[in-house]
Swiss-Prot record:
The modification Phosphoserine is found at S15, S71. Residues 208-485 form the Protein kinase domain. Gene3D superfamilies: Phosphorylase Kinase, domain 1, Transferase(Phosphotransferase) domain 1. The lineage of its organism: Eukaryota, Metazoa, Chordata, Craniata, Vertebrata. Mg(2+) binds at N339, D375. This is Wee1-like protein kinase 2. Changing L316A: Abolishes the cytoplasmic localization. PROSITE patterns: PROTEIN_KINASE_ATP, PROTEIN_KINASE_DOM, PROTEIN_KINASE_ST. Its main location: cytoplasm. Keywords: ATP-binding, Coiled coil, Cytoplasm, Kinase, Magnesium, Meiosis, Metal-binding, Nucleotide-binding, Nucleus, Phosphoprotein, Transferase, Tyrosine-protein kinase. One of its GO terms (biological process) is positive regulation of phosphorylation. A motif (Nuclear export signal) lies at residues 310-324.
Length: 555
């Protein structure tokens, strides 16, 4: 009887969610059992106060499970194949090709429910209790399933991250550990719902002071904010879609890409991201000059446009940013004026001297205006692309035809049309005959005359054949964009020639010194010998030793 009382009390402590079982067990208890239960009641109340709110009941659990069964299955993770025949012109809308379901669920949730054990009952408890209990294999797999896998990190890096000290395994490994273990993992809670449950208090209101709304785009709304701790201004972007409504990892590509890219002078800097109120929040660098599109609109209103020197400056700086992105194994795929941002350097900023410049990008650190690439929502990997079409006005034809062999050249095509718009070209067509006319290599009409070299470079950037377009690295070292590069090369050749002459003179001087050194040593020795012999001869004639003189005189 004592063992029965202990087991019943333990089961009552471990499973609060099964209220019906507790009611039935209380109805079958004897008077002695009731007395034992009453003696254990204060301990139960204390545990409830320490552990927080009671988890959902069985009815609520059944409702949530049935909802998960109705959610989409593994088809969510497969890319939708295009139509049998590639379109000849883009459609009017620029929506994603991939389906966007309203309810999200991992593929494993579509399978049957396994038997619920005591360990699974413990997993439904609060996170505070889980930290106080020993971690089991199920807990480790649960926490692993809640970790996002960044598609832009190398496979070896991900394995090193997840196999630290041989304790953590990749998802592929977990799927191959057998049917029994896979069944236990199949009914794990969805990653996104867990992130919502563990969401902290409003970080946005706690850490930032909102100044104004500065932009609204496809991703969401951007606010200008001051961080309360450091007093600096940041651009806080809040997603329009709810986090639970995001269809797939493409919606998180901006976070993934920013996290991998790191810091570059010509890419908008990324600081942090988090989930708040079921929306993705991204903390980025604030560019005080706004977007290039806003500057173009102001120029159009005043019947003024960027002149060739400024156009070259924009093209060169964005080429440096694209070169960095492409060298990182990614492409942007949505280059356009609204995704290029301007930073005006403050007067208090000190310029960087030549001795501090470590790369070609540092040449512009002392420039008064910096141009940066932002909005990496369409970024994808070059080796394993998952392409989502950007703005059709700047879209290369090969992307429309789903030819992804030369993805970096699609960014070059879009950059060429971006410079055309900045130079004064009218609004680019979304589709139709004019759209195809530009894709045949015809540069849009502009209201100003450009030099032949620069115009030829821009026209080559929108060449119909992707292979014929220059790379971002080639643009970054183009003599057309570097007006002083030819003169610099000439001065560098003269400097190298003078260095060669100086080195030759040094070698000849060293050789001459080496020849003169033995002669000086011979003359010095001869002088010392002659001086010593002369001293002996003179001393012998003039004066005898004092002891000998005294001895002679005494005799």
């Amino acid at each position: 009887m004592a063992d029965t009382e202990t087991d019943q009390g333990l089961n009552k402590k471990l499973s609060f969610s099964f209220c019906e079982e507790d009611t039935e067990s209380e109805g079958q208890m004897t008077a002695q059992d009731i007395g034992g239960a009453q003696s254990q009641k204060p301990g139960r109340e204390e545990s409830e106060e320490l552990e927080g709110p009671v988890p959902p009941t069985r009815d609520e659990l059944h409702t949530s499970l049935s909802r998960d069964k109705e959610s989409p299955g593994p088809d969510l993770w497969k890319s939708v194949s295009g139509p049998p025949k590639c379109p000849e012109t883009p459609v009017l809308h620029s929506k994603s090709k991939l389906p966007v379901p309203t309810n999200f669920s991992t593929p494993k949730n579509s399978l049957g429910q396994p038997e619920i054990s005591l360990l699974e009952k413990l997993s439904s408890r609060s996170s505070r209790h889980m930290r106080l209990t020993p971690a089991s294999l199920m807990d480790e797999k649960t926490s692993l399933s809640l970790v996002n896998i960044n598609p832009f990190t190398p496979e070896t890096y991900r394995k090193l991250l997840l196999q630290s000290k041989g304790k953590r395994k990749t998802r592929d490994y977990l799927e191959e550990t057998g049917e029994e273990e896979s069944k236990s993992v199949q009914w794990l809670p969805a990653k996104r719902s867990i992130l919502q449950e563990t969401n902290m208090a409003s970080r946005y209101e706690k850490e930032f002071f909102e100044i104004e709304k500065i932009g609204v785009g496809e991703f969401g709304t951007v606010y200008k904010c001051i961080k309360r701790l450091d007093g600096c201004i940041y651009a806080i972007k809040r997603s329009a879609k709810s986090f639970s409504g995001l269809s797939n990892e493409l919606d998180l590509h901006e976070v993934y890409a920013h996290a991998v890219l790191g810091h570059h002078p010509h890419v908008v800097r990324y600081y942090s991201s988090w989930i708040e109120d079921d929306h993705v929040v991204i903390q980025n660098e604030y560019c005080n000059g706004g977007s290039l599109q806003a500057a173009i609109s102001e120029n159009t209103a005043s019947n003024n446009h960027f002149q060739e020197p400024k156009l070259k400056d924009i093209l060169l700086q964005i080429s440096l940013g694209l070169k960095y992105i492409h060298n990182s194994g990614m492409v942007h795929l949505d280059i356009k004026p609204s995704n290029i941002f301007i930073c005006h350097k403050m007067q208090c900023d000190s310029p960087v001297g030549p001795e501090e410049a470590e790369s070609e990008a540092d040449w512009f650190l002392n420039a008064s205006v910096m141009y940066k690439i932002g909005d990496l929502g369409h970024a994808t990997s070059i080796s394993k692309p998952k392409v989502e079409e950007g703005d059709t006005r700047f879209l290369a034809n090969e992307i429309l035809q789903e030819n992804y062999q030369h993805l970096p050249k699609a960014d070059i095509f879009a950059l060429g049309l971006t410079i055309a718009v900045a130079a004064g070209a009218e609004s680019l067509p979304i589709n139709g005959d004019m759209w195809h006319h530009i894709r045949k290599g015809n540069f849009p009409e502009i209201s100003q005359e450009l030099s032949d070299d620069f115009y030829g470079l821009l026209k080559n950037m929108i060449h119909p054949a992707p292979k014929e377009r220059p790379s971002a690295a080639a643009l970054a070292r183009s003599r057309i964009l570097w007006p002083f590069l030819e003169k610099t090369d000439e001065l560098q050749k003269q400097l190298n020639l003078e260095k060669s002459k100086t080195a030759t003179l040094k070698r000849e001087l060293k050789k001459a010194r080496h020849i003169q050194t033995p002669q000086r040593e011979v003359h010095h020795c001869y002088y010392q010998i002659c001086k010593g012999s002369r001293h002996l001869l003179v001393g012998g004639r003039r004066k005898a030793p004092s002891s000998f003189t005294r001895g002679t005189s005494s005799v």
